[in-house]
Curated annotation (Swiss-Prot):
Alphabetized CDD domains for the sequence: RNA_pol_B_RPB2 (cd00653)
GO BP: DNA-templated transcription
EC number: 2.7.7.6
PANTHER family, alphabetized: DNA-DIRECTED RNA POLYMERASE I SUBUNIT 2
Record keywords, A-Z: DNA-directed RNA polymerase, Nucleotidyltransferase, Transcription, Transferase
Transferase as UniProt keyword: yes
Gene behind the chain: rpoB
Organism field: Roseobacter denitrificans (strain ATCC 33942 / OCh 114) (Erythrobacter sp. (strain OCh 114))
Name of the protein this chain belongs to: DNA-directed RNA polymerase subunit beta
PROSITE patterns in the record: RNA_POL_BETA
Taxonomic lineage: Bacteria, Pseudomonadati, Pseudomonadota, Alphaproteobacteria, Rhodobacterales
InterPro entries: DNA-dir_RNA_pol_bsu_ext_1_sf, DNA-dir_RNA_pol_bsu_external_1, DNA-dir_RNA_pol_su2, DNA-dir_RNAP_su2_dom, DNA-dir_RNAP_su2_hyb_sf, RNA_pol_bsu_bac, RNA_pol_bsu_CS, RNA_pol_bsu_protrusion
Length: 1378
């Protein structure tokens, strides 16, 4: 693998053997490309039809008024610059969006009243503002109201035509009833189905069924056309006194026993005798000879056949029989032929009768029987029938029925198959319509019914609806497009009405349009759609996975309850497209999936996966992306098929996939091969080393739990990785990458300034400033913090990681820590997956994480007067105000705990009647305390921490307090510093370029002290101030022009810099847009350090999870022979039954990696003593093996080598890619290299007694994660608190500060103990006896211990409910009763 800059600083030993010819595509490409297509569809010179915003406008416009005297046309659209950038939107709780301006043209016509001819009277064009269009951030998310959201892609059934059967469930006989459904992208569904009697029916929009011939009549076919479309015609000719002559099809008699002699019409020879079986050999002989073409059939054989065409008396025009009628022969008792339609035809001199080729074996009479049952005979009655079904209760007229039928399937505004639907239909029915033909055609419907009838006759196969060729992905762009179309259609109605009601000559397009519905549709989609989700921002992996998620739920999709097993199951076509492992446990299993690593979505919305081409057993490097449908035609080998040096298959038989089946195929038949073994799984699953040794259920848990890992204080990359960590860190946007190559100019914790050396354009300052995100709060309250990785003077390349983000370490994803674990029980503290940890872990902050809580308070304008944020709060002592500044807002850096005031706020309260005591107090102490109450923002119970940031927002025109002004000053200083730095680098750059241009040239004139025609030298330039260099006029015309251009560019750049600075400062100083009624808002961010403690949940990467049971002092933990205590004790019983053996291999491999790292450490110490590099080179060569050493390390200079060695002293990192990683032999080999025993087990000693344990223990280094289920967030206690209004019982749950439920079973327990008084308290005074609660409070205050329980409030609720049922239930007092 190619080494990146950081990859050289910390080399990973790569165990993969399969060469990858294709880099993994950008992981958030799905989101970005889809939305780009939606927004920028109008950039093409010729606008593409039907794509993106432009497509939506083209489909809705032009809008005509009702009289068609004016028309509103769409011309073009443009997105302006967004008002605020992403960061400002997040701080101000705004949506990151850009104003959308649409150019519309209003054309007014003059209509000549006599001729009705139109002439253009007036044309007006105008730009109209159509609301704000949300923009996507560079990381593929949207900022909506200040929070980051992700739009999840949706899987839905592809538009097109599908054939299916009911699996024999509908009818008791178990007969298969076939059905066909045409699903459009939008519009009415059309179903065709068989019933148990083999009659074909049609349904529109799942309504009442109609005979399918009714639909065909409505399309303008008559009986003859229908019969012609579905059946072949054969002609029966009458031979005098012999019978009928008909064509002979030898194939059809194979294997049958004829009921009459089969006689050759030409020779009269009996081919097959009656009742004797026809052998295949005899049939083959007949076909080969090809002589017999016609058979002679008995006269009565024509009975039961159906006429193919209307047979008419040429002279009178009378119809003998109609197409589809049955031919009959009637006999009297003694067998004499007396009548029937066939006899009538013969009697009338008709000797050739065209009949339908129905033999009831290969071709059934279904369509003919349907036609016979259908009471309609022509188009008009058929249309009326359809009208009655679609609009029951309305009197049908032919015109209305015809109009309705046309709008159902043939009107592009109401019905849209979409390009996908048309392509799918063409493929399934072998049609050749253009994919711009988006409505149905007559041929399509006829072909669908034909295919359905063929299925019933046993030809063709039904479709598999879970096949990925029949399911497609709707990504952000498309979902947004549909939503915007809905908004525009709402708007269209209003526009039409306005065009008809106003004086059209005087208005402009602006006056006709109210953009509210369109903007509202967009806002509603981003705010409340099921697919617009709060981004999972726990760590970089969870962000990436969230953006790559595919959901089958959501509008137009499935619901959890209705989704069966088949939809959720893994399908062969998922291979390389959707991950078979990563899906949630629980009700959503299989409905929410993840895109595989190499997969991409094509323009039709189908998921494609890459394959390498194979030609004549030779694997080429040509890569081809294929959708599931295309792949069905190929034979695909697996990536691990053995190849020789030339890239040919070694074996004659190769394991392959052919149309969904796994088979061994000859290698010459193979035409494709997988690109990589990891193309099967998703990003999260491909981060699990030794995945191939884990059970699938545990792998599922492993990939899901990695997403819940909390970023730790100090990230540490895994020793045993898979080599994909770097890709995730890069694509997630957590780490910062250099946009272009350059040299580091300045670095501090806040920002990196790079002087660019490549991609320089003329008008470019050549400065890139990267700001770090420092201690920002993520959606999940984890901490986002970025740290620079580079030093001043470093050279960086484009795309290189220059700063680490949360959970990244030197540009690699680092979700947890490498710790020493022992698989052994320890005094029962590992029972049921509990985990025992060493005190070192807690002491050294190994698993400590920072969490940031946001507190917000708003001062509103109330009816009684404005609320006020102040330090002057009634009845609060100075001690409680110690952390507040003069404005009443907490200082940054203050340590706060539950109940502390963060922001002081007072609210005016109304006059309430006063008790005498209060009157006395007011008389003594004056007015102030009475008219306001304390509504300060206080810290919630259970939250401790340090204030890290405060933001103050003021309404326009409200005077700013001291704190707001201070924050503003700091912000402006920061912006000025940025501007000055950029200016300094710009100056340096420009003057360097100027100097190189003018040095050594001759100046015609210059500033004071420069003689005419002097040569410009270094000394001369030193003497002049830099600003005066511009005044040196050069003799050479060309050089003078260059200097002129440079000067102009310099001025432009300075102006741009100043303008940008002014704009930013203006935004900082401007008031904020706050919700109505809010005068001022303060946000306080409190950071908490959470150490690892009992009750926290931890997990490995293999689905091995557990809860910490105890923290043991370091000296009591089991220790190794060299005195190293282990960090974690895990239960060995957690492995066998769960079958996730990958964790054991990881432990061994980690142990070997650590051992090799220690060897390097010793060599480094030797180097520091002696200054000799040889031991370091030897140790690295030993650790990495000769090949890696020769390729990557041998050529390093001393400084780089020592840095590289220093980075691996804690363990040599290795990469073992999924399905292509280290085998058991490699693990043994690594253990031996590191100087350990092959078993991977060590002798351990008990820390408490110092004695050796009875047998060797598996000890190793394992990567463990701390999950986002922290005991601090879950533990909760309450004495008194809020009560429910109706039942007066305490609320439930930590969020409501609720109580613990004493439920039915707990009551039984107290009953069983006979604890009557405890039980009474539980059910009354501790719960919902309002009077009792008060009495208890009083007695506690007075120091007494007697109280009595009253009636629980819930009993009163019950009484009221019974009264609501009309029963007057009363509670009688016992004394009164007597």
């Amino acid at each position: 693998m190619a080494q990146s800059f950081l990859g050289q600083k910390r080399l990973r030993k790569y165990y993969g053997k399969i060469r990858e010819v294709l880099d993994m595509p950008n992981l958030i490409e799905v989101q970005k490309s889809s939305y780009d297509l939606f927004l920028n569809s109008g950039e093409a010179e010729v606008p593409t039809d039907g794509e993106g915003i432009a497509g939506v406008f083209q489909s809705v416009f032009p809008i005509k008024d009702f009289n068609e005297t004016s028309v509103l046309e769409y011309v073009k659209y443009e997105l302006e610059k967004p008002k605020y950038d992403v960061e400002e939107c997040q701080q101000r709780d705004m949506t990151y969006s850009a104003p959308l301006k649409v150019t519309l043209r209003l054309i007014v016509f003059d209509v000549d009243e006599d001729t009705g001819a139109k002439s253009v009277k007036d044309i007006k064009e105008q730009d109209v503002f159509m609301g704000d269009m949300p923009l996507m951030t560079p990381n593929g998310t949207f900022v909506v109201n200040g929070t980051e959201r992700v739009i999840v892609s949706q899987m839905h059934r592809s538009p097109g035509v599908f054939f299916d059967h009911d699996k024999g469930k509908t009818h008791s006989s178990g007969k298969l009833l076939f059905a066909c459904r045409i699903i459009p992208y939008r519009g009415s569904w059309l179903d065709f189905e068989f019933d148990a009697k083999d009659i074909v029916f049609a349904r529109i929009d799942r309504r009442r069924k109609l005979p399918v011939t009714t639909l065909l009549y409505s399309l303008g076919l008559d009986q003859e056309a229908i019969m012609d479309a579905y059946y072949d015609t054969i002609t029966y000719k009458l031979e005098k006194n012999k019978g009928w002559v008909a064509p002979f099809f030898p194939d059809r008699v194979r294997g049958t026993r004829p009921t009459y002699d089969l006689v050759d019409a030409a020779s009269g020879e009996v081919l097959f005798e009656r009742g004797k079986k026809v052998t295949p050999r005899a049939v083959k002989k007949l076909i080969d000879e090809g002589k017999v073409t016609e058979l002679l059939l008995p006269y009565e054989h024509i009975a039961g056949k159906f006429v193919a065409k209307d047979i008419i008396n040429e002279e009178t025009g009378a119809i003998y029989v109609e197409a589809g009628d049955e031919l009959t022969l009637e006999y009297d008792k003694d067998g004499t032929l007396i009548g029937g339609t066939a006899k009538e035809l013969v009697d009338a001199g008709i000797t050739e009768i065209p009949v339908l080729d129905i033999d009831n074996v290969n071709v059934g009479p279904y369509m003919r029987n349907t036609m016979a049952q259908d009471k309609n005979m022509n188009r008009d009655t058929a249309l009326m029938d359809i009208y009655r079904v679609m609009r029951p209760g309305e009197p049908p007229t032919v015109e209305a029925a015809s109009a309705l039928f046309d709008t159902l399937f043939f009107d592009a505004e109401r019905y849209d198959l979409s390009a996908v639907g048309r392509v799918k239909m063409n493929m399934r029915l072998a049609l050749d319509a253009e994919d711009t033909q988006r409505t149905l055609r007559r041929e399509d419907i006829v072909a669908c019914i034909k295919a359905l009838v063929d299925l019933r006759d046993g030809r063709g196969d039904i479709d598999d609806i879970d096949h990925l060729g029949n399911r497609r992905v709707r990504s952000v762009g498309e979902l947004m497009e549909n939503q915007y179309r809905v908004g525009l259609l709402r708007m269209e109605r209003a526009i039409k009405e306005r065009m008809s009601s106003v004086e059209i000559d005087t208005v402009m397009p602006q006056d006709l349009i109210n953009a509210k519905p369109a903007a509202a549709a967009v806002r509603e989609f981003f705010g409340s759609s099921q697919l617009s989700q709060f981004m999972d921002q726990t760590n970089p992996l969870s962000e990436v996975t969230h953006k790559r998620r595919l959901s089958a739920l959501g509008p137009g999709g499935l619901t959890r309850e209705r989704a069966g097993f088949e939809v959720r199951d893994v399908h062969p076509t998922h291979y390389g497209r959707m991950c078979p492992i990563e899906t949630p446990e629980g009700p959503n299993i299989g409905l929410i999936n993840s895109l595989a690593t190499f997969a991409r979505v094509n323009k039709y919305g189908f998921i494609e996966t890459p394959y390498r081409k194979v030609e004549n057993r030779m694997v080429t490097d040509e890569v081809q992306y294929m959708s599931a449908t295309e792949e069905m035609r190929h034979t695909v080998a697996q990536a691990n098929a053995q190849l020789d040096e030339d890239g040919r298959f070694k074996n004659d038989l190769v394991s392959t996939r052919q149309s969904g089946d796994y088979t061994l195929a000859p290698s010459e038949n193979v035409d494709l091969i997988d690109v990589s073994p990891k193309q099967l799984v998703s990003v999260a699953a491909s981060l699990i080393p030794f995945l191939e040794n884990d059970d699938a259920n545990r792998a599922l848990m492993g990939s899901n739990m990695q997403r819940q890992a909390v970023p730790l204080l100090q990230a540490e990359a895994p020793l045993v990785g898979t080599g994909i960590e770097e890709v995730v860190a890069r694509d997630s946007g957590a780490a910062i990458m250099a946009k272009r190559a350059g040299i580091i100019d300045q670095v501090d914790a806040q920002r990196i300034v790079i002087r660019a050396t490549s991609d320089l354009e003329l008008g470019d300052a050549g400065v890139d400033i990267y700001r770090m995100r420092k201690f920002q709060r993520s959606n999940q309250n984890t901490c986002i913090n970025q740290r620079p990785l580079v030093k001043v003077g470093d050279t960086v390349l484009k795309g290189q990681v220059i700063a680490d983000g949360p959970s990244t370490d030197m540009g690699e994803l680092a979700l947890g820590k490498n710790v020493v674990v022992a698989f052994m029980p320890w005094n029962g503290y590992n029972y049921e997956d509990s985990i025992l940890i060493s005190e070192r872990i807690a002491r050294d902050d190994v698993f400590t994480s920072i969490h940031i809580e946001e507190f917000e308070v708003a001062a509103r304008d109330t009816k009684l007067g404005p609320e006020e944020i102040t330090r002057d709060i009634p009845n609060v002592g100075e001690e409680a105000l110690r952390n507040l500044d003069e404005a009443g807002i907490v200082y940054i850096g203050a340590d706060v705990e539950p109940g502390d005031i963060l922001v002081g706020k007072i609210t005016p309260k109304g006059e309430s009647p006063m008790t005498p005591e209060e009157k006395l107090l007011r008389a003594i102490f004056g007015e102030k305390a009475s008219d306001v109450r304390d509504t300060s923002l206080r810290v919630k119970p259970g939250d401790f921490g340090t204030v890290v940031e405060v933001r103050v927002f003021n309404r326009h025109g409200v005077e700013k307090d001291e704190r707001a002004l201070q924050i503003e000053r700091e912000e402006v200083e920061r912006l000025a510093r940025d501007r000055d730095d950029e200016m300094a680098i710009l100056d340096r750059n420009i003057y360097a370029r100027l100097k190189s241009t003018i040095l050594g040239k001759v100046a015609v004139k210059g500033p004071k002290g420069v003689s005419a025609n002097a040569e410009i030298t270094e000394d001369l330039l030193q003497m002049l101030p830099r600003v005066q260099w511009w005044q040196l006029a050069l003799k050479d015309e060309g050089d003078a022009q260059v200097v002129e251009a440079l000067n102009e560019q310099y001025e432009i750049q300075k102006r741009t810099l100043d303008a940008r600075f002014e704009d930013k400062v203006e935004k900082v100083r401007r008031g904020d847009d706050l919700p109505p009624g809010v005068m001022k808002m303060v946000k306080v961010f409190v950071a908490v350090k959470r150490k690892l403690q009992p009750g926290d949940k931890m997990a490995g990467r293999h689905g091995n999870k557990g809860v910490i049971s105890k923290v043991v002092p370091m000296e009591d933990m089991p220790f190794l022979a060299d005195g190293t205590p282990v960090d974690f004790c895990l239960n060995p019983l957690g492995v066998p039954s769960r079958m996730n053996v990958g964790q054991i291999l990881e432990t061994h491999m980690g142990w070997a990696a650590r051992g090799l790292g220690l060897n390097v450490d010793e060599a480094l110490q030797e180097y520091r003593r002696s200054g000799d590099l040889t031991p370091v080179r030897d140790a690295l060569s030993h650790a990495y093996g000769e090949n890696v050493y020769d390729e990557g390390i041998a050529g390093m200079d001393e400084e780089t080598l020592i840095e590289a060695a220093g980075n691996v002293t804690r363990g040599v990192p290795i990469a073992t890619p999924v399905f292509d990683g280290a085998k058991e032999g490699d693990v043994n080999d690594a253990l031996v290299r590191a100087g350990f025993s092959e078993s991977g087990q060590s002798i351990l000693f008990d820390g408490r007694t110092g004695e050796q344990f009875a047998r060797p223990v598996t000890v190793g280094v394992k990567y463990l994660l701390k999950l986002h289920h922290l005991v601090d967030d879950k533990i909760h206690a309450r004495s008194t608190g809020p009560y429910s209004l109706v039942t007066q019982q305490p609320l439930g749950g930590k969020a409501q500060f609720g109580g613990q439920r004493f439920g039915e079973m707990e009551v039984w327990a107290l009953e069983a103990y006979g604890a009557a008084y405890t039980l009474q308290e539980m059910l009354t005074v501790k719960s919902d006896d309002v009077a009792g609660r008060t009495k208890v409070y009083e007695s506690i205050v007075k120091g007494e211990d007697n109280f009595e329980a009253g009636v629980p409030e819930s009993f009163n609720v019950l009484v009221k409910e019974v009264r609501g049922l009309g029963l007057n239930m009363e509670l009688l007092d016992a004394e009164e009763d007597e």
